[in-house]
Amino acid sequence: MHMTHLIRPVAMVAALLTLTACEQPSDAKFKPASETTVAEAPAATVQGVEEAREFVAASETTLERLAQHHERVSWVLANFITDDTELLAAKSAEQFTLAQVAVAAEAARFNGLEGLDYDTARKLNMLKSGIVIPAPMDPEKTAEQSEIGANLKGMYGRGSYCREDGGCLALGELEDIMAESRDPAELLEAWAGWRTVSPAMKPLYARQVELANEGARELGFDDLGTMWRSAYDMDPAEFPGELDKLWEQVSPLYEALHCHVRARLAETYGSEVVPAGGPIPAHLLGNMWAQSWENIYELVAPPQTAAGYDLTAILNDEGYDAISMVKTGEAFFSSLGFEELPETFWERSLFVKPADRDVVCHASAWDIDEQDDLRIKMCIDVNAEDFKVIHHELGHNYYQRAYKGESYLYRSSANDGFHEAVGDTLALSITPEYLAKLGLLDEVPDASGDLGLLMRQALEKISFLPFGLMVDQWRWKVFAGEVGPDGYNELWWQLRERYQGVGAPGDRPADAFDPGAKYHVPGNTPYTRYFLAQILQFQFHRALCEIAGNEDPIHRCSIYGSNQAGERLNAMLEMGRSKPWPDALAALTGSPGMDATAILDYFAPLQAWLDEQNAGRQCGWQ
């Protein structure tokens, strides 16, 4: 869990920032964001080049020291949840936030300064654009924004739906209903019930947008959306179009999946509930936000779905425990030529849930000292899911170790989609062939079960793509003032129908604020990174399989045992954020442009099957 570069200036503080965790065509005009995003300062305020260089060096030293302290305090909190550790972590986060805020404000003094060397210019932009929600310079407005941010998160965290009989359901309980129920009336009640928590957020969110835009303009950006997009090594105005180009590449596969799923749902619920040729009602897809459709697998699965093995049962039969599962993950990376993990990793990580205290069980990878104090924190169960998650989390650790030689601001992924993509890429290599090489399978199963495996992955990964794209498309339009509070909800559903082919199940109330029912909106967490991670992981996987000499379909490829693949992967990882992400991408794939066609290659057998199933069906949506 690398503490990235996001914190906002002193006299202003506020709401704790979320930690920030790209794109394609080779003809895109990539250029340093510092040349494209920041308003030029009056000549009288321009500081000397040497002063700028010294400022950056001093800022890195200060932020690195505070970040390491905060990382240690956060680790203690995650492993020992008490009132005292919460207070210590909050104080540490406040100190780090204040320092970052001060640094961002100071960095804006150098706007428009010519003659800067590459690293100084790049790092100045990082210091300014790394803040998620910039506060205005006015202390009263800063305090107001801090209070709004805390209130929005609190409203979401305390949210629940209370039925007429007085019984109240928290989000987790409502999510269980969405995942398990097949009663459309019950699903609709749970879906609409959760959205009763968000209307009260709308005026607060609208005010937060005003304040954050003011803060962004004071740092030299047109608005907050421009500031967020400035982190992608290209003209922020061009970035949304580049994302749409990626979406256009993969949308035929999504539309085929959508067509099949809608037809099967119509068979289950009837055409009155699921009209032909229209958007799928959002409450029927097994997830509170219709962002993942895994929970309706049995309704849409191909007829031949057996994988031929039960990995959870095999792991238990073979006597695996938490440590041996992590050792197996480490051995995967060793087979690629990476060094073994340090002894401190095994001494300091959390692998199983303690019996004597509460801990944060959500799996995460940590880099405490930004050198070699690597750790993971998991409450590992011996099952197939955690076996995959371990490989994913170790991918973060090896990425963190690879870029440790870079300076503080460059110790991060090439863009905020790369870190998650690397973890997911390595999880794609957990194939039957890999399991056979480990001795967990006697032989590699034939391809008869591949469609079922691919369908499960598509319901997780392909269904997510349009949602991952549209959340920030909505926010950017809000930040740019293209729509006011009265139009927030209408725009939200316009974008959901345009990209997802998913619609609200009925008219929404006039005061509805459905974006607020998704944590990342009131929590102010940028979302494009998740879309990018889904695209990148398949592009990485295809390139690594080619480097490894794989001749099988890429959904059956594992790079286990390939030193050549490991060398190319490390060449990208060790760059960190020192170069524009197209350079890092080219170091691995040979091309600087993101390319979603790797997804089409991976899911080609499923696409062919879907096209057969959809013959004669009315696909698309109005």
Model region roles, listed by residue range:
Residues 2-11:
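Bacterial N-terminal signal peptides that target proteins for export
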Residues 18-21:
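C-terminal motif of bacterial Sec signal peptides marking the signal peptidase cleavage site
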Residues 25, 30-52, 84-86, 125-129, ...:
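C-terminal, non-catalytic "cap/extension" segments appended to globular domains
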Residues 166-173, 207-377, 446-447, 451-458, ...:
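Active-site-proximal, well-structured secondary-structure segments within enzyme catalytic domains
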Residues 185-188, 192, 356-383, 390, ...:
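Active-site scaffold of zinc-dependent metalloenzymes
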Residues 190-197, 229, 236-240, 305-318, ...:
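Glycine- and acidic
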Residues 243-253, 413-453:
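Post-HExxH zinc-binding segment in Zn-dependent metallohydrolases
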